[in-house]
Amino acid sequence: MINRMALREGVLIKGKAEGPPGGQGPRLTVIETVEGLSPENYSAVKRFDDLTPIDPHEHIRLEVGAEPLTMRIMDLFAPIGKGQRGLIVAPPRTGKTILLQQLAASVSKNHPELYLIMLLIDERPEEVTEMRRAVRGEVVASSMDREVESHVRLASLLGERAKRLAEMGKEVFLLLDSITRLARAHNKVVGNSGRTMSGGVDIRALEVPKKLFGSARAFEEGGSLTVMATALIETGSRMDELIFQEFKGTGNMELVLDRKLADRRMWPAMDLWQSGTRKEEKLLDPETLRRATMLRRSLAGLKPVETMESIIGAMSKHTSNASFLKQVARFES
């Protein structure tokens, strides 16, 4: 039936099932719809790899008010667009979990058209519960008490599910925490192929995580898949550092968190100089881009801590980015 109807992994099927003799699980006997379409009509849907990928050009606005300031700063200095492939680089205890919750809340409030999915891999069970209560979206998790095969299987299935939604023209926003733990799980599953990189990472271990991260794109025909994944650094593990280096530069947006800022209780603990978005001119209107660029230039030469102190101090005096940018324009004139 799968081959006859050209069903793709991750599709949502509605049909009739019967329990076979012998007490086995139910077996699908009749397929009524595939992704809400008749099987005949679904076969005409273009495959993900046959669609035309283009640069993100629709800005996902994160600002929801005066607070959280993190979302306002991201809008100006590390904007996200539909189809973005973003990496959140996070040392321990730099506010990664809160950042993800704020990101999910902003997306849910400002962009109800986005299908929000959060994938948690090898996370603490209590963190999973907290995310499910805080995030208004689909939270899928394989917690740390599950076997690594569960991590790999769930991530692969969810990645395919996201692609099926995107090829149907839907706008999908996938938050992955973390791509480091997913790569670790794959490293255990693939075993030892005899080709091991430094840090004990098998050369095949990164194939599937890279495929998942690389699936982020916007389509000329409509639809998009945005992937924002966290990468763990400064954990004391050579493996984690190698995984980060393999993913560094593969995205088109990076948000780098800084432990020194977090130690000073400065939020967001964001290194402005290492964070940014490629081709941000396609996301921000010309005036906003010009003023944000001018701000960066005015802060040039400052250390990350001094930079963020200045940004937080200036922006916290205004209840919106629009008000803040008007103030910037007055200084310019």
Protein language model features and the residues they cover:
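P-loop NTPase catalytic core
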Residues: 94, 103-107, 112-333
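Short nucleic-acid-contacting surface segments enriched for D/E, G, S/T with interspersed K/R
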Residues: 2-14, 24
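Walker A/P-loop
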Residues: 97
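P-loop NTP-binding catalytic core
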Residues: 10, 19-88
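Broad gene-expression machinery/nucleic-acid interaction feature
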Residues: 12, 26-28, 57, 227, ...
